[in-house]
Amino acid sequence: MIKPDDDRFIVGNDFPRYTFGFTYGLEYKGFDFSMMWQGVGRRNKWMRGESVEAFHNNNEGPVMDFHQDRWTPNNPDATYPRLTMGAESANNAAKSDFWIQDAKYLRLKNAQIGYTFPQQWMKKLYVKNLRIFASVQNPLTFTKMKGGWDPEYTGD
């Protein structure tokens, strides 16, 4: 007799098969712009925690997208399995390839725009160099992960 706990095999890989990144920058008449992109390919993530064990923090906290659209007799085409609570909550956390997500991504890690004032202007103020800039971190991510999870997240 095969026991369910013995009938398992390795699916997916949490370590990316490859990592890539590139930068781009340009400068024109004192204005500058730069950006850095980074990503990984062929990575899987086994989802755990709140997405699998809904309301596992003492049944408190906000209702998230993955708490909704659960299977019910009235919603047989739901995205997620039936939501259970208490002793039956193991139904949600059953080991299954359902909880493995494609975690490859491409992310704009940093974008920056700036302006460097001409040195002849700065000499009048006894300043050697002055540059103003604005920068943003992680403003854009392309991923197939569901539920709004960060594909760089490495915890459970």
Show which residues each predicted segment covers.
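Extracytoplasmic gating/loop element in the C-terminal half of outer-membrane beta-barrel translocons
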Residues: 40-131
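Hydrophobic, lipid-facing positions within transmembrane beta-strands of outer-membrane proteins
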Residues: 18-24, 31, 108-113
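Conserved small-residue
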Residues: 1-14, 75, 144
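Repeated loop/turn-to-beta-strand initiation elements of outer-membrane beta-barrel proteins
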Residues: 30-33, 120-121
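Strand-connecting loop/turn motifs
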Residues: 28-31, 127-129
